[in-house]
Amino acid sequence: MKFVDEVTIRVEGGDGGDGCASFRREKYIPRGGPDGGDGGHGGSVWLRADEGLNTLADFRHERKFTAQRGENGMGKQRYGKSGQDREIAVPVGTLVSDADTGELIGELLEHGQRLLVARGGKGGLGNVHFKSSTNRAPRQYTPGTKADRRNLHLELRLLADVGLLGMPNAGKSTLVRAISSARPRVADYPFTTLYPNLGVVSVGAARSFVVADIPGLIEGAAEGAGLGIQFLKHLGRTRLVLHVIDAVPLDPAQDPVDDARKIVAELGRYSESLAARERWLVLNKLDLLPEEDRDAHVNDLLQRLQWGGPVYRISALSGDGTRQLAQDVMNRLEVMDEEAREAGERARREQRQEEGPE
């Protein structure tokens, strides 16, 4: 199935049914009072997050979604039946905005979460509501109100804990295969990864995280070159970025340090907040060097990069170093979770102190 991460659709709620102007017509009651019932409410359109979906491709076949109209009111004070709601399944991680105004409507971040995107109209009132001491036979009624109608822009941003960043052919997809059950396409040429891939990495009982592999970046990506820039947004919700570098490129003209600097520059041009995210350096393909040459090669790379953060030496193909990397990532994410909980508790305590005793 083709990966589709943006789409525009049309949603229309159901209009409310009209109220009814009716009078009692019974034997021996020639001039019965009003008995017109109310119209039914129109159905609304909802979006619902479904963890079983991972693309917006289904919207290629259907772009307009309409809820049911409310039925009109009837005599004998019978109310019209309300219209059925329309529910549309979307992948978890979908961002919803108004396609015409750009206004953000909401995000669907949890399985089963629902978002109202087009409210149905209200049913009109029947003439029974307009009876008064001065108007015993009102012919007034109100029509149902119109429902919301709007164009929506849906944008899928994958939910992952960890994002992989790097040049084409750096070995990101091979790393995903090495540490997870995902099986992205792997081959010895650039741009093998054409769409983002997600993998679940398990490091023990009830301990796992989600990793996202996006297409590789090239110089000029922030201006639209290559394949990766359109998928950089999928790293926006990650908490940790692994910068994968081909430490031993087969092309002698290719410089790993120059490649790394280009990636960092493109990242900064795309998003300052993403560039400031915690980033670990992962030096891949070191198994291509004789063991006695590896330390000197790594030290030279780190010195030229002026890198002072975490660094890992791995071979994604053989699996060397990948288990330790996955374990350390899991430990770091758990520390982040604990830090977030503590920060939330501090914020709640400070809020209670500001509010004072009741």
Curated annotation (Swiss-Prot):
GO-annotated biological processes: ribosome biogenesis
Region (Disordered): 337-358
Uppermost EC category: hydrolase
Superkingdom in the source lineage: Bacteria
Oligomer and partners: Monomer.
Protein name stated in the entry: GTPase Obg
EC nos: 3.6.5.-
Lineage: Bacteria, Pseudomonadati, Pseudomonadota, Gammaproteobacteria, Chromatiales
Species of provenance: Alkalilimnicola ehrlichii (strain ATCC BAA-1101 / DSM 17681 / MLHE-1)
Gene: obg
Domain OBG-type G: 160-334
Domain Obg: 1-159
UniProt binding sites for GTP: 166-173, 191-195, 213-216, 284-287, 315-317
Record function comment: An essential GTPase which binds GTP, GDP and possibly (p)ppGpp with moderate affinity, with high nucleotide exchange rates and a fairly low GTP hydrolysis rate. Plays a role in control of the cell cycle, stress response, ribosome biogenesis and in those bacteria that undergo differentiation, in morphogenesis control.
GO cellular component: cytoplasm
Family: Belongs to the TRAFAC class OBG-HflX-like GTPase superfamily. OBG GTPase family.
Basic and acidic residues composition-biased segments: 341-358
InterPro entries: G_OBG, GTP-bd, GTP-bd_Obg/CgtA, GTP1-OBG_CS, GTP1_OBG_dom, GTP1_OBG_dom_sf, OBG_GTPase, P-loop_NTPase
Annotated positions binding Mg(2+): 173, 193
UniProt-annotated location(s): Cytoplasm
Entry keyword set: Cytoplasm, GTP-binding, Hydrolase, Magnesium, Metal-binding, Nucleotide-binding
GO molecular function: GTP binding; GTPase activity; magnesium ion binding
Cofactors named for this entry: Mg(2+)
